Amino acid sequence: MNYEVKEQMYEGKAKQVFATSDPEIVMVHYKDDATAGDGEKKGTIRDKGIVNNKLSNALMQKLEKEGIPTHYVQEINDRDTFVKKVEIVPLEVIVRNVAAGHFTLRMGVPEGTQFKTPILEFSYKNDDLHDPFINHYYALALDLATQEELDTIAKYAFKVNEVLKKIMLDANIRLIDFKLEFGRLSDGTIILADEISPDTCRFWDATTGAHLDKDLFRRSLGGEADAYQEVMKRLLG
């Protein structure tokens, strides 16, 4: 597939999105830029864009094989990928298997507590409001998504969790929690979009409990570039 790359449509914290000669396809470019604390902390993680691009593409393809529709179309090079153009549903969809991060402060649960069942959370994607947590009643009342869309999103989110947990465990990695984003195709179909990477997931070494994700940057622990490379090595060889 050969699409002509055109003007930049959007630039976010970690990616740039470009139009192409096909109105249904865009090109995503993954950057090394890193932010934390609502954008208060800024920096770079060496080769993060390469890791996130390759890892996300590989995982999206595995999820497709398990019946979860994704935006993935074609990897172009180390940092660029063609994906289906979507209208992003303005919800961050968070699945938690183990207590970590802000959840421990919010709920008073010690970090590392294994939940009996996965927790599904929504936050409203709005930078000005700092992405507040909401429930599905908010989403309906604010017209962020329909009930049918929310049901589909929840179904896919739990399925993604099942598939990813197994993939990660095979690589001796615990899937602690992760954030997903979904989008609508031009016909209204809901598909998985954005990325699946150490930027959007918490990965712990299953033996040592060592962090293998963006928490190393968030907490100024160091070693984040090596951790990202380690995840890619374990999952992609």
Question: For each of these PLM feature ranges, what is it?
Answer:
Residues V95, L175-D194:
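Conserved metal-phosphate-binding beta-hairpin within the catalytic cores
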Residues V73-R79, M168-R184:
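A short glycine-rich, hydrophobically flanked beta-strand micro-motif that places a catalytic Asp/Glu
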Residues N2-S123, L235:
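Active-site loop/lid in soluble adenylation, ligation, and acyl-transfer enzymes
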Residues T113-H130, N161-R174, S197-R202:
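Phosphate-binding core of ATP-grasp and ATP-grasp-like enzymes
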Residues L144-I176:
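A long amphipathic alpha-helix within ATP-dependent nucleotide-binding catalytic cores
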Residues D47, V51-L55, E148-Y156, V160, ...:
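Short amphipathic alpha-helical segments
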Residues T113, I196-G237:
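C-terminal helix-cap and adjacent tail motif
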Residues D47, R106-T152:
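ATP-dependent carboxylate/phosphate-activation module, predominantly the ATP-grasp catalytic core
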